[in-house]
């Protein structure tokens, strides 16, 4: 039952993050949909971690594959926060839209992190846990 509650909570927070992202694009005073390109970063961010968990050897304390995955994930997350700032600095979007998109980014990435904390705690990551 705890897995179901966690899944419902993660889905709710993901929906709230996407709502903030869409509000930053679709409100009448903003009306520009360029910030939706951060959706690409949402899709790309968990991929290095999935790959590193498949290829990792559990015998050593330092794992180069996992550290590279953390580095790539950090680059993807920083890029998703940088894109709205660059768009706002070039006057493509307004600063209010930038704030909404960045708040949505924070909520979505905390949701992705929460997914890994709740469902990825075992030795071998498995989709069968939920």
From Swiss-Prot:
- Has the keyword Transcription been applied to this entry? no
Annotated compartments: Golgi apparatus membrane; Endosome membrane
Q: Which domain of life is it from?
A: Eukaryota
Query: One GO CC term of this entry?
Result: endosome membrane
User: Which stretches are transmembrane?
Assistant: 7-27, 31-51, 68-88, 99-119
First-listed, main subcellular location of the protein, grouped into a coarse class = Golgi
Q: What keywords would UniProt list here? A: Endosome, Golgi apparatus, Membrane, Transmembrane, Transmembrane helix
Topology class, membrane: Multi-pass membrane protein
Report any Pfam family annotated for this entry.
Vps55
Summed up, the tissue specificity of this protein is: Widely expressed.
List GO BP terms, alphabetically: late endosome to vacuole transport via multivesicular body sorting pathway; negative regulation of growth hormone receptor signaling pathway
Q: What does this protein do?
A: Involved in protein trafficking. May be involved in the down-regulation of membrane protein levels.
Q: What family is reported? A: Belongs to the OB-RGRP/VPS55 family.
What is this protein identified as?
Leptin receptor gene-related protein
The species is Takifugu rubripes
Q: Which gene encodes it?
A: leprot
């Amino acid at each position: 039952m705890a897995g179901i509650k966690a899944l419902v909570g993660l889905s709710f927070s993901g929906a709230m993050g996407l709502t903030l992202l869409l509000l930053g694009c679709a409100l009448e005073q903003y009306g520009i949909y360029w910030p939706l390109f951060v959706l690409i970063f949402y899709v790309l961010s968990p991929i290095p971690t999935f790959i590193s968990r498949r290829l990792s050897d559990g015998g050593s304390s330092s794992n180069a594959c996992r550290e590279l995955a953390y580095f790539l994930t950090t680059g993807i997350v920083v890029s998703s926060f940088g894109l709205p700032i660059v768009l706002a600095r070039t006057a493509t979007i307004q600063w209010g839209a930038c704030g909404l998109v960045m708040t949505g980014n924070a909520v979505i990435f905390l949701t992705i992190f929460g997914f890994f904390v709740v469902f990825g705690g075992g030795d071998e990551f498995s989709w069968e846990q939920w």
